């Protein structure tokens, strides 16, 4: 009796708010627990996600070779070997260009330092040479005083390299299995779901993976265009290390909106040191032009409906990923959102296969 009286005394709005509140708290607690588990197994989760992203980029050529009658194992092997050959060739060429262009950059930097020193002495500042030398000596002394920290940083870098090598091996191992038997793996994983929803979950996975394929293809084309534009501009201006800087822009462009800009900042610094403030400002204008071309033409054209994410969601996802997992988190944030955006739409839809009907079934056979 008292319970019913108590319920009757509570306003309906309060009861509904309380019901939603405890459900929200349960969902929030589950998300926190999931993030905690992912953080504990980061050394496994991150390589698996990277392998999934790489598989989305490599599945289309594997499917193309399959459609030409090549055995699946041969197609996977050929695509992987071709990818390694292209990546190794690019890295070798970039490193050789960096080594060849470094002396010229050092010469230009020394010339810029001499020009700045003359300006500080002869310009409005009217500094004495002794003052500038003392400032340089103070900087050298500060480096010596922090030598222990720099040494420990080098040791931690060595440990990081070991972790990176281990992660790279795990990525390669996982990637091979995703390319060779991704569909079987996904079919096996979905057996954990009840039979009544199993088909819908499988369709959601296919839709999410289709968005990953679209995202990987579009991001690769955008990154290639950004790198070509920036590299060509730097080469025309005669900025040293144009090709290595363009390569940094290419890899940075895989983090949407901010990656290419952050990588391009280094190009601005090199242009400033090597060619002066005028060329640095031109480089800034070049980066802005490339960024506008990417935002208003390339991304809407090449991504299309496969990755329809609001720009605010992209920014928030990158920020959250960066806070949770650093650069890797920022790299994986947007494709993760793209995956769940399509997958959830299919899970909530009436026909689990409607949203993936327009995607080539060949591209989905690896999920």
UniProtKB/Swiss-Prot annotation:
A Pfam family: AI-2E_transport
Chief location: membrane
Residue intervals passing through the bilayer: 18-38, 41-61, 74-94, 161-181, 228-248, 249-269, 270-290, 314-334, 337-357
InterPro entries registered for this protein in UniProt: AI-2E-like
Keyword Transport applies: yes
UniProt-listed PANTHER family: PERMEASE PERM-RELATED, TRANSMEMBRANE PROTEIN
This protein's name: Putative transport protein MT0215
């Amino acid at each position: 009796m008292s319970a019913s009286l108590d319920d009757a005394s509570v306003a309906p709005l309060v009861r509904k708010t309380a019901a939603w509140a405890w459900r929200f708290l349960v969902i929030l607690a589950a998300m926190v627990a999931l993030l905690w588990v992912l953080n504990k197994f980061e050394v496994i989760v991150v390589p698996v996600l990277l392998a999934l992203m790489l598989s989305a980029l490599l599945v289309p050529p594997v499917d193309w070779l399959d459609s030409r009658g090549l055995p699946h194992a041969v197609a996977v092997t050929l695509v992987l070997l071709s990818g390694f050959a292209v990546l190794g060739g690019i890295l070798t060429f970039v490193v050789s260009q960096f080594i060849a262009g470094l002396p010229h950059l050092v010469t230009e930097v020394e010339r810029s330092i001499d020009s700045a020193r003359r300006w500080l002495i002869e310009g409005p500042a009217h500094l004495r040479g002794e003052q500038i030398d003392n400032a340089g000596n103070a900087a050298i002394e500060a480096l010596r005083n922090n030598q222990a920290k720099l040494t420990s940083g080098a040791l931690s870098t060595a440990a990081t390299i070991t972790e990176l090598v281990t992660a790279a091996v795990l990525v390669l191992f996982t990637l091979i299995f995703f390319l060779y038997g991704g569909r079987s793996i996904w079919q096996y994983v979905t057996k954990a779901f009840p039979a009544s929803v199993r088909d819908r979950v499988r369709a959601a996975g296919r839709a999410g993976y289709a968005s990953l394929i679209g995202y990987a293809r579009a991001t690769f084309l955008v990154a290639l265009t950004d790198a070509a534009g920036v590299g060509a501009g730097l080469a025309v201006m005669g900025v040293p290390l144009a090709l290595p800087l363009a390569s940094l822009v290419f890899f940075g462009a895989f983090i949407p909106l901010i990656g290419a800009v952050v990588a391009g900042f280094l190009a601005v610094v090199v242009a400033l040191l090597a060619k002066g403030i005028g060329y640095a400002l031109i480089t800034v204008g070049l980066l802005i032009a490339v960024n506008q071309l990417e935002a208003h033409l390339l991304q809407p054209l090449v991504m299309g409906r496969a990755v329809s994410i609001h720009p605010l969601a992209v920014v928030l996802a990158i920020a959250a990923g960066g806070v949770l997992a650093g650069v890797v988190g920022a790299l994986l944030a947007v494709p993760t959102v793209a995956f769940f955006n399509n997958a959830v739409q299919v899970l909530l839809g009436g026909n689990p296969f409607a949203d993936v009907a327009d995607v080539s079934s060949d591209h989905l056979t690896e999920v």
